[in-house]
Curated annotation (Swiss-Prot):
The gene is rps8. Keywords: Chloroplast, Plastid, Ribonucleoprotein, Ribosomal protein, RNA-binding, rRNA-binding. Belongs to the universal ribosomal protein uS8 family. It comes from the Eukaryota. It is found in: Plastid, Chloroplast. The lineage of its organism: Eukaryota, Viridiplantae, Streptophyta, Embryophyta, Tracheophyta. One of its GO terms (cellular component) is chloroplast. This is Small ribosomal subunit protein uS8c.
Length: 132
């Protein structure tokens, strides 16, 4: 049985948000890098960096907060397609989160992208996670 690196990343980010941590360190896999780039592009994280410790590669996400109470920009980060139950959608049926306010991250044949990009390019794929 393998590790679900996407679920590990999502759980690490969610826990860091709850603890109001400034940064979170996750394993740097190709899929985690692409999800991190989407989170940066959509404004959910401040910065994205990489760290190498020996043979291990890590990605450092700098989380974004707003106001004096430090409310996190990421209120919910949810894994959808899991190793035991993969969910694939046609581009017409990719769900909208919060009426388009949230982001759905599908993995397509052209790489990982946002739901808006997938609809624009008319490409369906496996729905990895929801972010809002």
């Amino acid at each position: 049985m393998g590790n679900d690196t996407i679920a590990n990343m999502i759980t690490s980010v969610r826990n860091a948000n709850l603890g109001k941590e400034e940064t979170v360190r996750v394993p740097a896999t190709n899929i985690n890098r692409s999800i991190g780039k989407i989170l940066l592009q959509e404004g959910f994280v401040k910065n994205l960096g990489e760290l190498r410790e020996g043979t291990n590669h890590f990605m450092i996400l700098t989380l974004k907060y707003r106001g004096r109470k430090r409310e996190p920009y990421i209120t919910t980060l949810r894994r959808i397609s899991k190793p035991g139950l993969r969910l694939y959608y046609n581009y017409k049926k990719i769900p909208k989160v919060l009426g388009g306010m949230g982001v759905v991250i599908p993995s397509t044949s052209c790489g990982t992208m946002t739901d808006r990009e997938a609809r624009q390019k008319q490409i369906g794929g496996e729905i990895l996670c929801y972010v809002w």
